[in-house]
Amino acid sequence: MIFIDACFKKPTPYTPIWMMRQAGRYLPEYMEVRKQAGDFLSLCKDYKKASEVSLQPIDILDVDAAIIFSDILVVPLEMGMNLRFEKGEGPVFGNPISTLEDLEKLDDQNAHKKLNYVYDALKLTREKLSQNKALIGFCGSPWTIATYMIEGSGSKNYAKCKKMLYQNPELLHKILNKLTQVLKLYLEEQIKAGANAIQIFDSWASALEYDKFFEFSFNYMLEISNFIKSKYPNIPVILFPKGISGYLDRIDGNFDVFGVDWSTPLDLARDKLSHKYTLQGNMEPCRLYDKNAIKEGVEKILKTMQNKAHIFNLGHGILPDIPVENAKYFIKLVQESSAK
């Protein structure tokens, strides 16, 4: 698999490419299946439909890897939190965590056993996927998941989380530790079900100041990665902490690929990290609105990463109103322009 070879810094015939949120709303085929499922969470829980939408970008765009269709918040859902998706405001937890008693009500022993719909979707997708295409499993970082569990929804300033961080750091560490243990088992089951690689999404990394990022986020991601790498050395682990271009000097540990977001200068990440890790990224997602902007972005990134281990991706998820034709153009352009 070209994608796995690139993760491990092996030579590849061209630069492999996939897109975050590639199974998503910009595809009419996805919207059709989502409509059949009824709502977003029902789609996540219907393993046949989740597998179908995971495979759509392979069939339509010919990307080099599929990522399983799911959501980072199915983990706290199966730990016993009350999750719903509100139109216009995204995920909402009806019972956010603010005390140790709230945390102790959550089931960390059996949560990973209740996520069979994810493992079944992985098994089915791996069966249907061509042998040369990789299948990526994933989870959210403990910190990013915790922000939703504590805030009760998405947040502009993470005030409840940060209040806990400064007033009661022991409680926040207990929440993060509990999540970390569940996520280790969850990812292990994903690997057993057929995932060829794992990505940990730390979408809200940039909400933390420098030292606190390493204490409350990065160290927990490393604990998960160390667990995976010790048991499954042939499974690459990708970390994607978004928005931390100022923190790159301290990024170190046992993982394989570092995801670079679009706000981080790629040459900066290359100079600081490419001797240790394959870099993944980092085209500005809005470039996909315009073919000239796509061409300019692709050329610049390929030039920056010339002779370095690289997986092409967007620097965040593809947006819902991107024309499919532009996405196809983008994928093909990367694969053809980077061909050795």
Curated annotation (Swiss-Prot):
CDD domains found in the cross-reference section: URO-D
Site (Transition state stabilizer): 71
Gene3D superfamilies per the UniProt record, alphabetical: 3.20.20.210
Subcellular location: Cytoplasm
One GO cellular component term: cytosol
Top class in the EC scheme: lyase
Keyword vocabulary terms for this entry: Cytoplasm, Decarboxylase, Lyase, Porphyrin biosynthesis
EC code: 4.1.1.37
Entry GO MF terms: uroporphyrinogen decarboxylase activity
Name by which UniProt lists this protein: Uroporphyrinogen decarboxylase
Source organism of this protein record: Campylobacter jejuni subsp. jejuni serotype O:2 (strain ATCC 700819 / NCTC 11168)
Gene: hemE
